[in-house]
Design a protein with these regions (language model features):
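Positively charged, low-complexity intrinsically disordered leader regions
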Residues: 171-213, 379-387
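Conserved acetyl-CoA-binding loop-helix of GNAT-fold acetyltransferases
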Residues: 76, 82-95
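YjeF_N-associated NAD(P)HX repair module
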Residues: 170-180, 289-387
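Nucleotide and nucleotide-moiety/phosphate-recognizing core
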Residues: 206-295, 304-325
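Active-site rim helix/loop that mediates acceptor-substrate recognition in acyltransferases
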Residues: 24-52
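Conserved GNAT acetyl-CoA-binding A-motif
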Residues: 96-114
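Short amphipathic alpha-helix that is part of the acyltransferase structural core
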Residues: 1-31, 155-163
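Conserved beta-strand in the GNAT
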Residues: 49, 55-63, 68-75
């Protein structure tokens, strides 16, 4: 008998579900897995593990609205594909959500055309039909499908998807001290510090627009901000993207050291800034990369940027590389947005909550796009979020 169980942090086969998610969907189509768990079964989302009695089959992730329900992710355990389970699962799931919809890659010339045709045939066999409406998700063009006879207004689809993505972007604004206190409270009561650092790095990794064939340089300081960068470097390396690390100095926070060691074990190249690397040398080096990830200073930085970091930041700003700043632009005051010099980013990925300095007029001169990512940080004496 097919049955569905809610997925949360206590699900017994959570690691298997995570691995299937990584196997079934390319990284450009994935959101961070911790977010899947964080907002699963909340705010109009169902994240369900699927079983045939006690036999695990896979998972389904659905956005549930008043007008329609939309399958965002659906995957069957690798060894059970072609076994008829996909049809049985959809048959049972449509009893729960009669106005069920999904999206597939359109049938047009592509490297995976055969796979696209098989997917279309599968869903048609299971009572879905194309709706002549195309949408873009995670930068990928898709074609909507719905149960036979079903009409979908594009605005209902967009409303559903927007609600989901808005659900893990925190809108609250904190001071640097308030953010530090929230970090400490979360680590003391909910999430291990290494796990929280991993979540931060994973969030930055998914926001970045890097692809296979790109060259990425992670420029890292000595604090936890650098640790986020080491997580990103390892994830890039896993995906086959060329990545290197430039250390300002060989000094690490405890958690940063942990993730830097993983990078070393996995063969990621790194260099250490030295006196021979003047502005021109750095500029020439930076121009050879497609992306630079700025992890030099975190939100706790204040005062003036001194050499050799001053010349390094100037070279980043003058280079042709696209720049992503982790949590805050290095050199910027997290409360005021002021800086004598700071990294100019194409995108800044704020972690947890927006910081006051990031939304000032002064900061806007240095930030191309500002994105804030919820990683489950909880403020004491507030409405605690699922972590």
């Amino acid at each position: 008998m097919i049955r569905f169980e809610t997925i949360d942090e206590n699900t017994k086969n959570l690691e298997e579900i995570k691995q299937l998610y990584f196997d079934a969907f390319p990284f450009e189509e994935r959101i961070p897995f911790y977010i899947m768990v964080l907002v699963g079964n909340d705010r109009g989302v169902e994240f369900l593990s699927i079983y045939d009695d006690d036999k695990w089959l896979g998972f389904i992730h659905t956005l549930v609205g008043d007008e329609l329900s939309y399958i965002f992710y659906f995957a069957i355990e690798n060894s059970l594909r072609q076994s008829g389970y996909g049809s049985r699962i959809l048959h049972e799931y449509k009893k729960i959500h009669p106005r069920l919809s999904l999206a597939i890659e359109p049938i047009e010339e592509s490297d995976n055309l055969k796979q696209r045709k098989k997917r279309l045939e599968f869903y048609r066999k299971n009572g879905f039909e194309t709706l002549d409406t195309r949408v873009v998700e995670m930068g990928v063009e898709l074609e909507l499908m719905g149960a036979k006879g079903m009409e979908i207004r594009e605005r209902d689809y967009k409303k559903l998807v927007k609600k989901f993505f808005d659900s893990f972007e925190q809108k609250r604004v904190l001071s640097v001290k308030e953010m530090r206190d929230a970090d400490s409270y979360t680590i003391a009561n909910f999430v291990d510090s290494k796990e929280l650092m991993y979540r931060a790095g994973e969030a930055i990794f998914y926001v970045g627009d890097w692809n296979i064939g790109d060259k990425v340089l992670v420029v890292a300081g000595s604090g936890n901000n650098a640790g986020d960068g080491y997580v990103v470097a390892d994830l890039l390396n896993i995906e086959g993207i060329d990545v290197e690390i430039l250390l300002i100095k060989e000094k690490f926070s405890e958690d940063g050291q942990y993730y830097f060691n993983i990078c070393k074990q996995n063969g990621i190249k790194y260099n250490i800034l030295d006196d021979s690397m003047d502005y021109q040398t750095l500029l020439d080096k930076f121009n050879s990369y497609d992306y630079i990830l700025d992890c030099i200073y975190g939100t706790g930085f204040s005062g003036e940027v001194k050499e050799p970091v001053y010349s390094l930041i100037k070279a980043i700003n003058d280079s042709n590389a696209s720049v992503v700043s982790a949590d805050i632009n290095s050199g910027m005051n997290g409360d005021t947005g002021e800086a004598d010099i700071c990294v100019n980013s194409d995108i800044t990925v704020s972690i947890g909550f927006l910081k006051k300095g990031l939304i000032t007029d002064e900061a806007s001169k240095h930030i191309g796009e500002l994105v804030n990512m919820d990683i489950g940080i909880v403020i004491e004496n507030s409405d605690n979020r699922t972590v």
